[in-house]
């Protein structure tokens, strides 16, 4: 799948569209998107083997589509059955096939004209073929488009339209930077314009890609000789000719980058708040959100995050979506209400401020997290433990990363609370502090590091085996989990029956489990903390589906 889905420019285009919508339209579309996972699956398939140009094209079409039209179309799509979607898709594929066949016919006619030396008429055929492929995804029409562009460059060279040849070559090299024919023919155009330095640059690259081609080597040698004898000749215009519009856009974009980023940042925060507010105030939207998360393939959720999800794997998304799927509507609503009350940015976002000034979890938040973890089945916990065992728990961290990790347990909405079914593991499983006397995060980290020492673990296991229930309850309280005397007695009895090796092994697993809990919390927080971003991505996905089915752009 094309990872550019999370590209900042793509997100900006989606958020621009969202900014044009009323809150009612936005809530309506997000609910419709979440109510039909088949649309997501179709979009995922549509985006395979895509180039950035394809997604940008869909985003541009989205920009020119009125929000009210988008809402009406998405409503029809949400109500469509899988059979209806398949029929629409078949119709769109048939249209694509028709356009591709027409382009192939035009290309063949152009080739015949080119072979007879009628280069002007051949160029016209190639241009018409390219125009037919304008709305076709590159995975289907990319090969024909490339052939037409390269043949068009040949026609331009033969008719001395060197400027047009350079522009066409620059277009090809924009998505295929090592295309030998494009480099060679653009180099020839530079040479004929007297731009010898630019010609040498392109021809040298072509020679690097295809060193055995004697024709390229001969032309390169000739241009180098002319450069040595005649000098650079005209002032090099290679960059200006090649990317005149693009370079101007880049320059303008660089000058405006800070203000754009600031505006986008503010819009992103507002979008998150608006999205969560709409979700919080709409029980039906909460239900469809839960259905969407629980039914959507974890690979799809992971793919939507692109490279911005850090080290969260599909397994982490699977764990989070499983937990969300088993929550009651009331719990989902409480979760959203809690998330919508957060101030500031998502602390996991790349531009997030320091977490030192973050919020302090309230008792309600901790109770909510506790209830969630208490309802996890043993199989889910085991899966979380297995997932944690593969993480780099012992990797060294920088100071800033350490600070973020230290503050994360106070900010996370995740695994906190108790469950009598696993009470003897709970004190080491990363539960959140629920009383003021809990040790700070840096002290907990220091204790975990000390427990990596085998001698320290042996001493600690011996101490635990001989600990009475009162001491067990007191120690669990220090770890943020208050056990009753009965639970403490059960935990002490269970530990006393373990062999030293088994107890030490259990402690190692508990340490890994703590890391697993934190990763799972991070995945879950990502799902809820980036609500506006997710819906922005969904807007792009919807645009891709509608573009594929011919609703927009055709």
UniProtKB/Swiss-Prot annotation:
Swiss-Prot/TrEMBL TPR repeat ranges: 103-136, 180-213
Residue spans, topological domain Lumenal: 547-554
Highest rank taxon of the organism: Eukaryota
Annotated GO CC locations: chloroplast outer membrane; endoplasmic reticulum membrane; plastid
Disulfide pairings: none
Biological process annotations from GO: cytosol to endoplasmic reticulum transport; protein transport
Keywords: Chloroplast, Endoplasmic reticulum, Membrane, Plastid, Plastid outer membrane, Protein transport, Repeat, TPR repeat, Transmembrane, Transmembrane helix, Transport
Membrane topology: Single-pass membrane protein
Transmembrane segments: 526-546
Residue ranges that the UniProt entry lists as topological domain Cytoplasmic: 1-525
Region Disordered, residue ranges: 245-269, 395-439
Basic and acidic residues biased stretches: 254-263
Known tissue expression: Ubiquitous. Highest expression in leaves and lowest in roots.
Localization: Endoplasmic reticulum membrane; Plastid, Chloroplast outer membrane
InterPro entries reported in the protein's UniProt record: OEP61, TPR-like_helical_dom_sf, TPR_rpt
Keyword flag Transit peptide: no
Compositional bias annotation for Low complexity: 412-423
Keyword Aminoacyl-tRNA synthetase: no
UniProt remark on domains: The TPR region (103-213) is necessary for interaction with HSP70-1 while the linker domain (214-530) facilitates selective recognition of chloroplast precursor complexes.
Subunit structure as annotated in this protein's UniProt entry: Interacts (via TPR region) with HSP70-1, but not with HSP90-2. Interacts with ERDJ2A and ERDJ2B. In the ER membrane, associates with ERDJ2 in membrane complexes of 140 and 200 kDa and specifically interacts with the HSP70 and HSP90 chaperones via its TPR domain.
General function of this protein: Plays a role in protein import into the endoplasmic reticulum (ER). May function as chaperone docking protein during post-translational protein translocation into the ER. Chaperone receptor mediating Hsp70-dependent protein targeting to chloroplasts. Interacts specifically with some chloroplast precursors, but not with mitochondrial precursors. Able to select precursors for delivery to the chloroplast translocase independently of Hsp70.
Protein name: Outer envelope protein 61
Gene for this chain: OEP61
């Amino acid at each position: 799948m094309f990872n550019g889905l999370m590209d900042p420019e793509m997100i900006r285009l989606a958020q621009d569209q969202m900014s044009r919508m009323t809150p009612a339209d936005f809530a309506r579309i997000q609910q419709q998107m979440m109510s039909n996972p088949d649309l997501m699956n179709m979009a995922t398939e549509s985006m395979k083997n895509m180039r950035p140009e394809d997604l940008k094209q869909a985003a541009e079409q989205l920009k020119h589509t009125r929000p009210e039209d988008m809402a009406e179309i998405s409503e029809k799509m949400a109500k469509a059955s899988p059979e209806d979607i398949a029929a629409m898709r078949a119709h769109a594929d048939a249209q694509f096939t028709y356009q591709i066949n027409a382009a192939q016919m035009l290309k063949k006619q152009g080739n015949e004209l080119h072979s007879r030396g009628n280069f002007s008429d051949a160029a016209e055929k190639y241009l018409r073929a390219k125009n037919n492929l304008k709305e076709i995804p590159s995975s289907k029409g990319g090969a024909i488009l490339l052939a037409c562009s390269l043949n068009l460059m040949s026609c331009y060279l033969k008719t001395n339209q060197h400027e047009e040849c350079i522009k066409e070559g620059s277009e090809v090299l924009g998505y295929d930077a090592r295309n030998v024919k494009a480099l060679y023919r653009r180099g020839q155009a530079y040479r004929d314009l007297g731009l010898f330095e630019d010609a040498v640059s392109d021809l040298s690259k072509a020679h690097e890609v295809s060193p055995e081609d004697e024709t390229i080597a001969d032309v390169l040698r000739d241009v180098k000789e002319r450069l040595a004898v005649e000098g650079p000749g005209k002032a090099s215009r290679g960059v200006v000719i090649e990317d005149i519009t693009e370079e101007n856009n880049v320059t303008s974009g660089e000058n405006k980058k800070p203000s754009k980023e600031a505006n986008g940042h503010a819009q992103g925060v507002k979008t998150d708040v608006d999205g969560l507010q709409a979700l919080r105030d709409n029980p039906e939207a909460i239900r469809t959100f839960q259905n969407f998360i629980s039914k959507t393939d974890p690979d799809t959720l992971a793919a939507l995050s692109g490279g911005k999800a850090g080290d969260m794997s599909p397994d982490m998304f699977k764990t989070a979506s499983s937990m969300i799927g088993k929550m009651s509507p009331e719990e989902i609503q409480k979760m959203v209400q809690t998330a919508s009350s957060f101030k500031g940015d998502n602390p996991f976002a790349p531009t997030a401020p320091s977490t030192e000034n973050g919020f302090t979890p309230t008792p309600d938040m901790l109770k909510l997290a506790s209830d969630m973890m208490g309802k996890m089945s043993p199989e889910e916990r085991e899966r979380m433990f297995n997932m944690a065992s593969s993480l780099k728990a012992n990797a060294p961290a920088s100071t800033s990363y350490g600070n973020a990790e230290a503050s994360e347990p106070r900010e996370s909405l995740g695994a906190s609370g108790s469950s009598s079914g696993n009470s003897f593991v709970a004190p080491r499983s990363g539960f959140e502090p629920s009383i003021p006397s809990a040790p700070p995060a840096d002290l907990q980290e220091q204790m975990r590091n000390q427990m990596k020492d085998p001698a320290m673990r042996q001493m600690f296991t011996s101490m635990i085996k001989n600990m009475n229930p009162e001491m067990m309850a007191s120690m669990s309280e220090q770890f943020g989990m208050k056990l009753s005397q009965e639970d403490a007695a059960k935990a002490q009895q269970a530990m006393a029956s373990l062999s030293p090796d088994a107890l030490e092994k259990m402690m190692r697993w508990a340490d890994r489990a703590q890391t697993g809990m934190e990763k799972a919390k991070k995945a879950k927080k990502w799902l809820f903390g980036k609500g506006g971003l997710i819906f922005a991505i969904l807007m792009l996905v919807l645009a891709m589906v509608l573009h594929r089915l011919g609703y927009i752009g055709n």
